[in-house]
Amino acid sequence: MDKYEVVKDLGAGNFGVARLLRHKETKELVAMKYIERGRKIDENVAREIINHRSLRHPNIIRFKEVILTPTHLAIVMEYASGGELFERICNAGRFSEAEARYFFQQLICGVDYCHSLQICHRDLKLENTLLDGSPAPLLKICDFGYSKSSLLHSRPKSTVGTPAYIAPEVLSRREYDGKHADVWSCGVTLYVMLVGGYPFEDPDDPRNFRKTIQRIMAVQYKIPDYVHISQECRHLLSRIFVTNSAKRITLKEIKKHPWYLKNLPKELTEPAQAAYYKRETPSFSLQSVEDIMKIVGEARNPAPSSNAVKGFDDDEEDVEDEVEEEEEEEEEEEEEEEEEEDEYEKHVKEAHSCQEPPKA
């Protein structure tokens, strides 16, 4: 930690809080995610790190290294100064079809690259897509905590992801192909960019999980009259939002769809993308998998109750103190959200018991 200095707080994510730091020698800005040592360091964290390390693509946040502090595991990664794509949509209300396509093209290229390495993200959403600071922003996929590699693990069965983005087969609690589920989530992302709302939520009752789940299972959505989009775009959405995942459009087919191909930037064409698929492409990280797993293994040991930040300078002590404060706030928020999550689980079970997903 001696080589970094704190710049500012970046907020909280699925597993911990994040901060912006600057490398003291190179002056490079990095994002650092802090995860409390002990019980929070589970297989999801290890999977996120190992999967993330293997990814080398311009539309994916770069993994740099992991660092062990007396109280936390710190994951160091590329900093995307443009913030979340979610914020950009909130500020704009919704995007033009051309702007939505520009970001969708990048999202598809990033997800397709992940799938080529047998890594499914499983929690694709606007909040997990960041932007760099350039005038024509590069989209960067982040947060691989729920991702699952089919090379290392069985097909996913758990219900993970944000309710609004979840595919019907994920709700079924049977084994499903994570690649098909990612395509569905990409479709939800495209819809939100175009419309400024979620496709399967009742705008008058957005927290009604039962209704959202029923609409997902029935593929019940519509494009509002005030949103003017091309027939090609409507066709693509109709091919993505298909209940039977085996009949859903694939990433390979999306990349050949006329709407996707329109104004496709040169760097996103198949010949340009081919360079990233070469297996000999080295990792961005200088840390070996063995070194990372050793550090993660040590992080599973809880922080000592005394002298937790012994040997740290004042800046680092401040970071640890602030991280602890934010985590306390997070725990309070989690307790408040538990009832809603229980309600969500209850409605998922109800949906299973009362209906089978309709055939598409």
UniProtKB/Swiss-Prot annotation:
Triggers of expression: By salt and osmotic stress (at protein level).
Catalytic activity, as annotated: L-seryl-[protein] + ATP = O-phospho-L-seryl-[protein] + ADP + H(+); L-threonyl-[protein] + ATP = O-phospho-L-threonyl-[protein] + ADP + H(+)
Cellular component aspect of the GO annotation: plastid
Signal peptide extent: none
Basic and acidic residues biased stretches: 344-360
Tissue and organ expression note: Expressed in seedlings.
Protein kinase domain location: 4-260
GO molecular function, one term: kinase activity
Annotated stretches, region: Disordered: 298-360
Transferase as UniProt keyword: yes
CDD domains: STKc_SnRK2
GO biological process, one term: response to osmotic stress
InterPro entries from the UniProt entry: Kinase-like_dom_sf, Prot_kinase_dom, Protein_kinase_ATP_BS, Ser/Thr_kinase_AS
Active site per UniProt: 123 (proton acceptor)
Keywords, sorted A to Z: ATP-binding, Kinase, Nucleotide-binding, Serine/threonine-protein kinase, Transferase
Ligand binding (ATP): 10-18, 33
Entry EC no(s): 2.7.11.1
Residue stretches of biased makeup (Acidic residues): 313-343
Family: Belongs to the protein kinase superfamily. Ser/Thr protein kinase family.
Stated name of the protein: Serine/threonine-protein kinase SRK2H
Top-level taxonomy: Eukaryota, Viridiplantae, Streptophyta, Embryophyta, Tracheophyta
Encoding gene (name): SRK2H
